[in-house]
């Protein structure tokens, strides 16, 4: 049996979640994805989970819905999922740089 991953998050992720709540997004959808990641369950294809490149090399991106993303890092050696950002494409990639 595989042990679950520890889940950590950034302060920016916490701010992003607050913004998502203010926008009326269903946070349960986000939490459902985090739960799947925590137990290393493969995400269904509808989430379009994939590795990023360039400035975001090493980060994973999945789509909670078409314009609601979750960016995270996954360290398989020490079994930690680090939640980095969540928000729209423009929230995260708007200026082309990491925030």
Task: Name each model feature, range by range.
Residues 36-63:
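A short, surface-exposed loop/turn module that caps and links secondary-structure elements
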Residues 19, 61-63, 73-74:
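Short histidine-centered beta-strand/loop micro-motifs
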Residues 8-44:
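N-terminal first-folded block
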């Amino acid at each position: 049996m595989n042990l679950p991953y520890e889940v950590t998050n950034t302060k920016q992720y916490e701010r992003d979640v607050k913004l998502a709540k203010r926008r009326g997004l269903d946070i349960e959808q986000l939490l459902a994805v985090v739960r799947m990641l925590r137990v290393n369950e493969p995400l269904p294809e509808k989430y379009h989970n994939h590795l990023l490149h360039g400035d975001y090399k090493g980060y994973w991106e999945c789509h909670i819905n078409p314009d609601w993303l979750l960016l995270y890092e996954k360290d398989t050696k020490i079994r930690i999922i680090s939640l980095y950002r969540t928000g729209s494409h423009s929230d995260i990639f708007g200026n082309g740089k990491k925030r």
